[in-house]
């Protein structure tokens, strides 16, 4: 009998123990990360050939205490290595663990290598060579506090390497973890399996191998025991022959059907190649498809299992498509897969909650460094309508708004407009359309609102929005709105660089829905920009706090003699330049200046016929004791702007301060008169939110119109 150790991913030890016992192992004992067991030569070779869950099978050679590097050296050298492998074989050492004396695994591996080489040299006057890549023999040393364990790795390469994936790392799941997921899913051999997000097909291939009784080690071409001097080739040949016979028979007899789909054609090509190499291609149908539009590919016959490892994001707020996908997927399961089982393996329990399904079983496991969960669901035998009334009041309001506004927007010649703006207090979001894409802005809920309820309402809003507007998952973007401080409004939220052009009257603008808090176009200023265009012919135009220069574009298209665009952000100025180029507004008459607008304003001595300024409500600045407050400081601002405004010129001043009050008495002292035009600048899509901005036209005193 051999004493052996099978390692596995944490969380899979009990499954592995059961598997080894089925293979004939005795005296199985679970420890963290594996199972100790006893077995004769046949059991040992069968565990190597047939274990779907083990990472490695190790043959312990010695165990001893280590209080110094000399103890490590002597303990390893005490093994008669000439009885383990030939001096003509290559070897490598894998060392893990440290203690007070051996603090570096590389140092530990070096001491072990020296001990093995010296052992051969003293006995045979020859030394074996070390090979880092595919050595004939792999020695495993594990140091835990003062105890060292030395073992021969009978596996060679990890047992998760079955030989059917030709590129390492082409899939996020190791094969032995995938096998565990299949076993935990509740799937029964003989019933169908569907993976609607199959990637390179690992889950389906592992399940098909089980259905066809195909040993996971059958097609491996390298083992760690072939150079072991006690290797019994005859028993190994018997194990191989038995596995070959069982596979041929199993492949002929199985009636299981497997269907995999994925939106990415390239990974499907990988999946087909992997299935061919595994010998189970005839059992699996791979087809391109979007999981958010999944139909049951096997509606007739026995109910089966939908099993998948869906995508997940590091930040939920940056992955609205995943929220939408999971939410839709839950409805699809209930409506199109009655009596089926559903099992999903994910690193995001929060995303799984979007399914709105109650799990009957739950398992935890590690996928590399990630803490993951597998949840199993038993779907009702009564199909639900796919038109589930999620957030019904919100959906009805959105449907009504879309019907009214879509026709209006087409008449106006605009691609971007607001569809919904917290019309219903319990659904505190804004929904904006940008051509065929939609942005949902979640206003950060107050602390008094239960976070879980707020999150679930957001999920409902996403689901209802996609359902009402007929969106696919890649047409939706989610943003969270909260007060911006300092430079946070300029900071990147993503790096997708997905710009596209939209139309606003006769202007074109580049928008980016993902990378920044804002999209590049303030929709509520649409009419103000149009008015500036109508006022600009033959004028010298100044745009302060210009953002991406949308007002400058309208002024340029309106025939402005010159435009000057000032903003502190290089990113937004480059964006403004792209907007000008998209509208064929190029030349030296269109200046772009990167500067702190307040500092630039204080030193500027040019004059302009038409000025547009839309300052922040509050910001930090090097001037005015480091802050700017539009209510407190607007008269100071007007005083500076008056110097730059030509006689007969017009200043348009807008801000987003709720309850803003113009100081008319101080304004009169400055020598300016103001006319509020807020109602004239508010368009139909912002009719419900009269306080989204306030807007004023100012002129020199005595020039009132």
From Swiss-Prot:
Alphabetical list of SUPFAM superfamilies matching this protein: S-adenosyl-L-methionine-dependent methyltransferases (SSF53335)
Record carries keyword Transcription: no
Catalytic activity: guanosine(2445) in 23S rRNA + S-adenosyl-L-methionine = N(2)-methylguanosine(2445) in 23S rRNA + S-adenosyl-L-homocysteine + H(+); guanosine(2069) in 23S rRNA + S-adenosyl-L-methionine = N(2)-methylguanosine(2069) in 23S rRNA + S-adenosyl-L-homocysteine + H(+)
One Pfam assignment: RlmL_1st
Catalytic activity, EC: 2.1.1.173, 2.1.1.264
Alphabetized InterPro entries for the sequence: 23SrRNA_methyltr_KL, DNA_methylase_N6_adenine_CS, RlmKL-like_Mtase, RlmKL-like_Mtase_CS, RlmL_1st, SAM-dep_methyl-trfase, SAM-dependent_MTases_sf, THUMP_dom
Keyword match Acetylation: no
Subcellular location: Cytoplasm
Cellular component terms (Gene Ontology): cytoplasm
Residues of the THUMP domain: 43-154
Keywords (A to Z) from UniProt: Cytoplasm, Methyltransferase, RNA-binding, rRNA processing, S-adenosyl-L-methionine, Transferase
PROSITE patterns linked: THUMP (PS51165), UPF0020 (PS01261)
Enzyme class: transferase
Top-rank taxon, per record: Bacteria
GO molecular function, one term: RNA binding
Protein family membership: Belongs to the methyltransferase superfamily. RlmKL family.
Function: Specifically methylates the guanine in position 2445 (m2G2445) and the guanine in position 2069 (m7G2069) of 23S rRNA.
Protein name per the record: Ribosomal RNA large subunit methyltransferase K/L
Species name: Photorhabdus laumondii subsp. laumondii (strain DSM 15139 / CIP 105565 / TT01) (Photorhabdus luminescens subsp. laumondii)
